[in-house]
Amino acid sequence: MHCRLFRGMAGALFTLLCVGLLSLRYHSSLSQRMIQGALRLNQRNPGPLELQLGDIFIAVKTTWAFHRSRLDLLLDTWVSRIRQQTFIFTDSPDERLQERLGPHLVVTNCSAEHSHPALSCKMAAEFDAFLVSGLRWFCHVDDDNYVNPKALLQLLKTFPQDRDVYVGKPSLNRPIHASELQSKNRTKLVRFWFATGGAGFCINRQLALKMVPWASGSHFVDTSALIRLPDDCTVGYIIECKLGGRLQPSPLFHSHLETLQLLGAAQLPEQVTLSYGVFEGKLNVIKLPGPFSHEEDPSRFRSLHCLLYPDTPWCPLLAAP
């Protein structure tokens, strides 16, 4: 009874804070009182219940240039199934998207450039919004990812609730090496694993709380500058080099930088994330026959969605089993 009461309190706080915070532009110096209040609420919770989709905060990073070409596809497909858990982080206002998403569209003060500081600025916005939410898991994806909610929940349920968890797919088959800037123009060689942001990754709350000194607000951009690497690398650096944690590699996350055609149709429902794009000069998409042609559905996301959810109104009847 007490667990459910605390869960209800957390849900109410989440709704109020998100409406008040996420509908406005993000400011790098997010109110410390709001963060501390969320942390105190988390500490009062006597024990977690079984993980549910409603416990997961899903952040989608995008930019103005892709509002039409990418976001409409996501909103029509997987986001429609978990809209309450999904927040879109962008760099420019969009009245049409605002009407469709309401407070789930977060317009940051970050630059639209594809630069390390701009990317790190958005990641900091995602991270701080998660802290305020009070939810149990933070999952980051890009705007060219398809998220399978059932597979995501199933994966996260496998991890012990009392351990720090950082799960995703490494983009390299070895740790990355970086030069960490130190005082007096000195550098220190560091090595660590990181989950590629293009495939998505997840971090549980107790680990996220430990990351705050390096990842909250402007600290994330500063930390990224220390190693002069992008936002996803910075997450791995904080967890492995600053906190002594470890990446839990998972083959269920996928980016457009791998050969997606190698996944069989029978494997697709088991994957947590999928992607599409151009790789080595060729269109790189999952291999999935119908129900839409490649001209109608070049990303194959609509066909995948109909495979997973054949009851979707716009799916052809032949998609049903």
Swiss-Prot record:
Bilayer topology term: Single-pass type II membrane protein
Protein name: Beta-1,3-N-acetylglucosaminyltransferase manic fringe
Thermal characteristics: Optimum temperature is 37 degrees Celsius.
Lineage of source species: Eukaryota, Metazoa, Chordata, Craniata, Vertebrata
Record carries keyword Ribonucleoprotein: no
EC primary class: transferase
TM segment ranges: 8-27
Cofactor note as given: Has some activity with cobalt, magnesium and calcium, but not zinc.
